[in-house]
Amino acid sequence: MPKILIFNYMNMRKTFLATLCLFSGMTMYAQQIDVQPTPQQVKEATATIALSGNYQFNGEGEANPYAISALKSLLNSKQSAKEGIRIYIGERGDKSVRKYNKFIPKQDEGYFLRINEKEIVLAGNDEQGTYYAVQTLKQLINDNQLPVTEITDYPEVRFRGVVEGFYGTPWSHQARLRHLKFYGENKMNTYIYGPKDDPYHSSPNWRLPYPEKEAKQIKELVQVAKENAVNFVWAIHPGQDIKWNQEDRDNLLAKFEKMYELGVRSYAVFFDDISGEGTKADKQAELLNYIDEQFVKVKKDVTPLIMCPTEYNKSWSNVKGGYLTTLGTKLNSSIHIMWTGDRVIADMYEGDTEKGGMKWINNLIQRPAYVWWNFPVSDYVRDHLLMGPVYGNDLHIANLMSGFVTNPMEHAESSLLAIYGVASYAWNQDVYDSQKAWRDAIKTVLPSAAHELEIFATHNADLGANGHGYRREESAALKPIAERFLNEYLNKDTYPMKDFLKLTETFTLMQEAADILMVNTENPALIAEMKPWLIQHKLMGQLGCEVLTLTNALEMDTPNGFLRKYKHIKALQQQMFNVDQPYNQNPYQPGVKTAGLVIKPLIDKIFTKAVELYNQKYNAALDAKTDYMPHTLTSDVNQIKNLPLRQKTNRVLVSPANEVIKWQGNGTMTIELDKVYPLLPIDIDFGQPEVAAWGVLEISTNGKDWQKVDYQQNKNRIRVNGDKTAVKAVRFTNRTDKEQEVYMRNFTITVEK
């Protein structure tokens, strides 16, 4: 037998070389085992065995049937042979693996995997654990060889997965099926179905059963989830129009019964992003306890209920009002409570009971919070793709959470990079490596063009300015080079040649990567999602190269060459504008933004400086403008002050927000235009009737003297005809002392140009 070394990932990444004895049937082997997610403990071996194709299965009659099916598919073996490698598979207590009980970890979903020249043991602490043992075995097979090893493994976080809880276009049925398989392969056990734009999930149709087509699809999702060891959780969002009476209790239970008939065995109730009567904590607790006692506990095979509270983050919590403490004391202890962190979009940290973090919320709700992590969700920055690494959450807080689920983008395939990282993080936080997980995800999602996808994802990670103030690193390796180049060029009219060459290489690689990805056929769904951003990404690379060439033409004193490049740059800017107009035209943040954190500001500043130098040198008046936002928004309302302004032709609009905005008494929002314009319509939708009872609309020609504008409302919509009145600024004020709960669905100023 070869000498075997214990490699404990808690003392991670030790370099070693084991001494190996030679014997028949085994091959020399010296390589660290790489499994996703990283196991808790591995015995590294220095030998491999060859798979013969003949296997003696032990435990088929007792073990998880889905694990058995996955194993036979993996080994391409339909039945047990009379000779060959003996395979023992089963759960703790099964006859087939009873002699290995002492090796099986006692944690939920834990497993023990042993591979040697005589046997393969796949022993789970439960059925999930057995399935995960098979998934690990699948990753270990390389060119029909297996390493001689032992793995003892289990997850640190009990529930790990995805909540489809974003606003926007729900995923397609086929995308969900692909995702469920991906979750199983990466040991994620939870998929919460809660798309905000599913009419039968939310108001007003949550009381109605799904039509036949949709019901059939959900039934298939439930079955595929089971086959991949994923818990399909169906969520309902009744809070906006629920009545706290027996009729709606019965309506909710009837809907749950309908879902139960479709195979659903796990449920969630969401009370997020609502206002009015549905936000009362005592009523929510009463209803959820009723469901728990009359449905969950009665059914026996239904898992504990999950709820998303109305106050689901610290910044919106009114601790003195008692909402969270009411849930903590009145809600049955088996019910999970979801939490997004200190803000709507936030990373998780340990904290303390006084200031914030996981300890703060757990103290209030008297149980570990079930984390709803709002990344890479992009429903508030829909003109961006968020394809960067998963990072920012503390690495030693697994014991402070009951679950960790990621809320993804509406772009299902593009979300897989982050989902892969979350799978790795939630399984084994202590050794989580965000960069490794990100690069491994890229290789998994698009192996044939991993290099090109990494280039693209590197420059499509940040969110840009947004109402939540949440940002991500982007183009990180390029940032110091860009800063050094700009410092020299803006202050000394020169630049380091090595930085010039590195930037040129980067911009060239951007173009090449976009071209290669656009014709890739390995993952058509992914390429289709990325296509608008790939087009824009290539143009950005071209723009960068031409701007650098512009500086060189100026330095070489070739004005004709400068003008030729200037003309081309203007054409590229126009092309980027043209891409921004037809693609991704959602009503919230339409258009296509790429490489916005480091690269675009770098290109814009170089261009502006080069044109200014040219104008000075040749007494010219070339336009040095790049695209920019000439108008400004100011507000003392916390949830409004960071909302981006957007301009589409002659319309200036406030970027809509998905969540309820708490507009304090006497709070204002002011939009100041860059100059005086003839005013056309102003369109407003705050998602509530009778806005005139508290809201005052005013306009100004100078930003100092204000004139009140009367308006009328049709349902939730307000339109004021501007009649070409001169306007420089528009202001809206809550004139009362009372806080108003509104939605920023539309605030658009249209002017004549």
What is each residue range found by the language model?
Residues 100, 105-255, 261-265, 297:
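Feature activates predominantly on carbohydrate-active enzymes
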Residues 722-736:
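Noncatalytic modules at the cell exterior or secretory-pathway interfaces
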Residues 599, 605, 609-679, 685-695, ...:
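Disordered, acidic Ser/Thr/Pro-rich linker "stalks" and the adjacent N-terminal cap
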Residues 1-32:
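Bacterial Sec-dependent N-terminal signal peptides
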Residues 434-625:
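C-terminal functional modules
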